[in-house]
Amino acid sequence: MEVNILAFIATALFILIPTAFLLIIYVKTVSQSD
């Protein structure tokens, strides 16, 4: 169970970090365009 939890956390971070990074860039781009 612990391994599954760690794998879930690792996967979540692996997905969320790049997504958040792209989201920040997108927001900045929209703000500059507007």
UniProtKB/Swiss-Prot annotation:
The keyword Plastid appears for this protein: yes
InterPro entries for the chain: PSII_PsbM, PSII_PsbM_sf
GO cellular component entries: chloroplast thylakoid membrane; photosystem II
Keywords assigned by UniProt, alphabetized: Chloroplast, Membrane, Photosynthesis, Photosystem II, Plastid, Reaction center, Thylakoid, Transmembrane, Transmembrane helix
KW Transcription (keyword) present: no
Superkingdom to which the source organism belongs: Eukaryota
Transmembrane segments: 5-25
One Pfam family named in its UniProt record: PsbM
Membrane topology: Single-pass membrane protein
Subunit structure: PSII is composed of 1 copy each of membrane proteins PsbA, PsbB, PsbC, PsbD, PsbE, PsbF, PsbH, PsbI, PsbJ, PsbK, PsbL, PsbM, PsbT, PsbX, PsbY, PsbZ, Psb30/Ycf12, at least 3 peripheral proteins of the oxygen-evolving complex and a large number of cofactors. It forms dimeric complexes.
Function: One of the components of the core complex of photosystem II (PSII). PSII is a light-driven water:plastoquinone oxidoreductase that uses light energy to abstract electrons from H(2)O, generating O(2) and a proton gradient subsequently used for ATP formation. It consists of a core antenna complex that captures photons, and an electron transfer chain that converts photonic excitation into a charge separation. This subunit is found at the monomer-monomer interface.
Family recorded in the similarity comment: Belongs to the PsbM family.
Name listed for the protein in its UniProt record: Photosystem II reaction center protein M
